[in-house]
Amino acid sequence: GVKSVCLLDNEKLNETDLYSQFLAPPDKIGGNRAEASLQRAKALNPMVDISTETKAVDDLPDSYFPVFDIVCATGLKQEQLERINNICRDNNKKFLCGDVWGMFGYMFADLVDHEYSEEIVQHKAVKRGPDDSEKSARETVTITVKRRAIYVPLQNALSADWRKPELRSRLRRGDPSYFVMKILLRFRDEYNRNPDPATRKT
């Protein structure tokens, strides 16, 4: 199970935040979002040690992140996400990131070099009797197979040059939401905020 969790956020809680998460109560508006979420987060599982960090990601040294077995990031700029991901990879730590904009969201996982087990169902022929003329029956057998997955860093996933012939052929088979994600990440990088659903203005 989970031994400990650290909530890292340097932003202040506002009214809009209350529509996207349930950990921070309304009476904590104006306070730090991580600290405002601490009490309800602890109530989810009193056996887990939950702490907070109120510094900005850019103010934390590279040595801060390898302390954790897995780092989950959201609401950050692409450069910040890539920095944290690279630190995690260099220290063989797992990294997840994602975001939600209205009805659209994405999730990225970099588990570096990940081994896992998968159950495979096989059908084997089994003789019903000692006589070769007897019809054989089919028996269902479940076996456990070890698998290995090698992940790529976020920087590689986002820097693919789709003008290259070897990648251009994949465009029709690919998911167009990949490019929506890139546009939204670029918007945040350029304007230092998310698109405003109340207006079309940039």
Residue ranges and their predicted role:
Residues 1-202:
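Adenine nucleotide-associated cytosolic modules
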